[in-house]
Curated annotation (Swiss-Prot):
Enzyme Commission number: 5.3.1.6
Gene Ontology MF annotations: ribose-5-phosphate isomerase activity
Keywords: Isomerase
Single GO biological process annotation from the record: D-ribose metabolic process
EC supergroup of this enzyme: isomerase
Protein name as annotated: Ribose-5-phosphate isomerase A
Cellular compartments per GO CC: cytosol
Catalytic activity: aldehydo-D-ribose 5-phosphate = D-ribulose 5-phosphate
Family: Belongs to the ribose 5-phosphate isomerase family.
Record organism: Pseudomonas fluorescens (strain ATCC BAA-477 / NRRL B-23932 / Pf-5)
Length: 223
């Protein structure tokens, strides 16, 4: 199977997993990126069976609306049963690196609210140790140099992602060359740097379920 076919398979598996648990009052949290887009397209075939969605980015909101799915502001939603999103990397404990699409802060907020975080990814994203994929850090623009110096002290090699402004008006530093053996601790350390909005480690709140697309079919991993 191609990578696109694997993404479509895990997206459909996520729809199949949540659909029996949705009703006309249900609101679904939706992530950002190519795999999340596959999920949106698959979910749209059932748009009459649930109320609407909360989007983790402007791009996701536009795609949902394009399918005729109502999009709600998170502040107006009291209950979010599911959040479905892709990942750039996952370890066996379902700690994730996310943020390749620069939507990490809003993704982390929606994931924090949801009762169940379902990650959908192809098999190439499952790794023994996080860090081969550069770790994105969202930074207040005036703090870029300060944050970069602090990230070097933590053992990383930060690179400014040129030409990228987040939906929140901030910039991204991608931290290379980190072997992340304690993701919970590192997530906290980076977030404690003044000027950091958040970083792409999802370890304090990891995924609850990982639907992994493989050549043999979709495998389900749980934290």
């Amino acid at each position: 199977m191609t990578q696109d076919q694997l993404k479509q398979a895990v997206a459909q598996a996520a729809v199949d997993l949540i659909l029996p648990k949705l009703d006309d009052k249900s609101i679904v949290g939706v992530g950002t990126g190519s795999t999340a887009n596959c999920f949106i397209d698959a979910l749209a075939l059932h748009k009459g069976t649930f109320d609407g969605a909360v989007a983790s980015s402007e791009a996701t909101a536009a795609r949902l609306k394009g399918h005729g799915i109502p999009v709600y502001e998170l502040n107006t939603v009291s209950d979010l049963e599911f959040y479905i999103d892709g990942a750039d990397e996952s370890d066996e404990h379902l700690n994730l690196i996310k943020g390749g699409g620069a939507a990490l802060t809003r993704e982390k907020i929606v994931a924090a609210v949801a009762k169940t975080f379902i990650c959908i990814a192809d098999a190439s994203k499952l790794v023994p140790v996080l860090g081969n994929f550069p770790l994105p850090v969202e930074v207040i623009p005036m703090a870029r140099s300060h944050v970069a110096r602090e990230l070097v002290k933590l053992g990383g090699d930060p690179v400014y992602r040129e030409g990228v402004i987040t939906d929140n008006g901030n910039i991204i530093l991608d931290v290379h060359n980190m072997q992340i053996t304690n993701p919970v601790e590192l997530e906290s350390q980076i977030n404690a740097i003044v000027g950091v909005v958040t970083n792409g480690l999802f370890a304090a709140r990891p995924a609850d379920v990982l639907l992994l697309g493989t050549a043999e079919g979709v495998k389900t991993l749980k934290a």
